[in-house]
């Protein structure tokens, strides 16, 4: 059979259905579609395989992480237990380091406390010695001052007694009570009983002075001048006494004492103030006001520490003059 006979179509039989026509282009399209479908299935299979591999890898990594974390926890727990055991035994390095630091701080505080105690003890001893010396000095000063005050009081009393004696000698005749010469008559029966005369009072046993010594002496000298010349002068009379500045008229000064201070010549003076004391005989003394009384002041000489009493009357009449001076 030739090729033309093979390729030529067979003649159609009578009464049979007509055969379908064959197109080569359609076969190629079918084959291409099948290949595409197979390639798609292959790709899907590969993707599924990759997804499964990734899931397995993730599960494996998670297990490794959990295992690693557990291992770290166990290691850390073991380390803490080991440190706790060393701490209980006292061999932990950190514990020994901190204990050494605490011990140094303890020793430092003990040393500082001992030094502070020593310093305070020395300070207390110094204060004790200082206070003791001050107390002894104050006692000695008070003792000397008391002795001086007593001596001054005794001297004043002695002077007052001498003045009383001098006054009694000068006015002895006037002090004597002379009896009155009266003529006694017989009392008649109807006359009343005579009443004794009580107008004359007896002389006091002690003289109370309201004036200063200088004022008394000045009054006595005045009385002596007014006496009769028939009476002989006694050696203790004012004519035989040395003249004093009070005989001449003196300038009046304003002097008074208020609230424990002396107001003199428009100036105020207080206790422990340094002054100059000038007398009528032009004697100038450096003094310190020792005390201020009600009607007089006490001054202490800086040269020999003796004390003098100055009355307000003496300052007012100018028998003594007070001047200020520097405390240095």
UniProtKB/Swiss-Prot annotation:
Region (Mediates interaction with USP17L2): 2-170
Low complexity composition-biased segments: 1-16
Record field: compositional bias (Basic and acidic residues): 56-65
Sequence position, cross-link Glycyl lysine isopeptide (Lys-Gly) (interchain with G-Cter in SUMO2): 69, 178, 201
Domain of life of the organism encoding this protein: Eukaryota
UniProt region (Sin3 interaction domain (SID)), positions on chain: 188-226
Subcellular localization, as worded in the UniProt entry: Nucleus
Mod. after translation: Polyubiquitinated. 'Lys-63'-polyubiquitinated SUDS3 positively regulates histone deacetylation. Regulated through deubiquitination by USP17L2/USP17 that cleaves 'Lys-63'-linked ubiquitin chains.
Keyword Ubl conjugation among UniProt keywords: yes
Keyword Nucleus included in the entry's annotation: yes
A single Gene Ontology CC term: nucleoplasm
Stretches for region Disordered: 1-65, 226-252
In-chain residues carrying the UniProt-annotated modification Phosphoserine: 32, 45, 53, 228, 234, 237
UniProt modified residues of type N-acetylserine: 2
Phosphothreonine carried by residues: 49, 244
UniProt record similarity statement: Belongs to the SDS3 family.
Subunit structure, interactors included: Interacts with HCFC1. Homodimer. Component of the SIN3 histone deacetylase (HDAC) corepressor complex. Interacts with SIN3A. Interaction with SIN3B enhances the interaction between SIN3B and HDAC1 to form a complex. Component of a mSin3A corepressor complex that contains SIN3A, SAP130, SUDS3/SAP45, ARID4B/SAP180, HDAC1 and HDAC2. Interacts with USP17L2; the interaction is direct. Interacts with FOXK2.
PANTHER family linked to this entry: BREAST CANCER METASTASIS-SUPPRESSOR 1
Protein's recorded name: Sin3 histone deacetylase corepressor complex component SDS3
Originating organism: Pongo abelii
């Amino acid at each position: 059979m030739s090729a033309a006979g093979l390729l030529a179509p067979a003649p159609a039989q009578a009464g049979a259905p007509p055969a379908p026509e064959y197109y080569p282009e359609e076969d190629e399209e079918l084959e291409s579609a099948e290949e595409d479908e197979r390639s798609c299935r292959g790709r899907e299979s590969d993707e599924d395989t990759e997804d499964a591999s990734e899931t397995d890898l993730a599960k494996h990594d998670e297990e490794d992480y959990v295992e690693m974390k557990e291992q770290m926890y166990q290691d850390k727990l073991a380390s803490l237990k080991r440190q706790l055991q060393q701490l209980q035994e006292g061999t932990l390095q950190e514990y020994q380091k901190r204990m050494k630091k605490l011990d140094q701080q303890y020793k430092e505080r003990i040393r500082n406390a001992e030094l502070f105690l020593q310093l305070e003890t020395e300070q207390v001893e110094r204060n004790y010695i200082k206070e003791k010396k001050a107390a002894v000095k104050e006692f000695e000063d008070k003792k000397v001052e008391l002795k001086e005050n007593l001596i001054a009081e005794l001297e004043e009393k002695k002077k007052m007694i001498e003045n009383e004696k001098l006054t009694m000698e000068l006015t002895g005749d006037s002090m004597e009570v002379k009896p009155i010469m009266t003529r006694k008559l017989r009392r008649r029966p109807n006359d009343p009983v005579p009443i004794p005369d009580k107008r004359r009072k007896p002389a006091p046993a002690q003289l109370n002075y309201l004036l200063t010594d200088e004022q008394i002496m000045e009054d006595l000298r005045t009385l002596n001048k007014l006496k009769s010349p028939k009476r002989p002068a006694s050696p203790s009379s004012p004519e035989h006494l040395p003249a004093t500045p009070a005989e001449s008229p003196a300038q009046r000064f304003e002097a008074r004492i208020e609230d424990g201070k002396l107001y003199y010549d428009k100036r105020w003076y207080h206790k422990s103030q340094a002054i100059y004391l000038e007398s009528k005989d032009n004697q100038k003394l450096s003094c310190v006001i020792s005390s201020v009384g009600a009607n007089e002041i006490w001054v202490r000489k800086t040269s020999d520490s003796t004390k003098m009493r100055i009355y307000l009357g003496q300052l007012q009449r100018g028998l003594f003059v007070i001047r200020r001076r520097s405390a240095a």
